[in-house]
Amino acid sequence: MENERCLDLKYAKLSKAGEIIEMLCICLGVFLIPLFLPKLLTIVFGKTSVIASNSQYVVGSVVNTLLIIAGVNAKGWKKVLGIVTLPSISALFGGLVLKASSVYTMYMIPAIWIGNFAIIYLYRYLFVKKNLNYIVTSAIAIITKCAAIYAGFNLLVLVNIVPNGSKVFTSLNIAMGMNQLVTATIGAVIAFGIIITMKSKKVSE
């Protein structure tokens, strides 16, 4: 019975100290990963490697994993707000994830915040509170996040902040569209593995 319901349960019940440590780790992760992971991948694999040249997919996948874990196990909306805002702030200051298009990140920040909040909120509300199946929750949360961010991008195009047909448009169209869908999906898969692992560990104890 436990295995049958493992998709509908939180992965762990932490002590107060454990919750604080978990949230600190997540906050540090979502801030530092966009800032330093691309450079690390370049050093380790080389600038022209497939992994380093597509570092935004690696960064986005890890950040989405942390956002989902926060949605499943975080307590208190004040903590969540920090987790929602830190990745885009890190990307803005580092100028790493979107590279040449990073100057436009500041215009996308509100949409990214809304998207990040949506994925955390929906996992918390649907998966944790309503016990909805993880896969269904993931589909709803990922689509909502991607729609919010891509809508923000299209608004910038509509008001001509991002010129339609330009190189910046092409870059951001991918970064705020397909990139978001791919990285959120990968993040959901990784988070699922973490949740199941922690749940299995809890059951065995």
Residue ranges of model-derived segments:
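Loop-helix junctions at membrane interfaces
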Residues: M1-E205
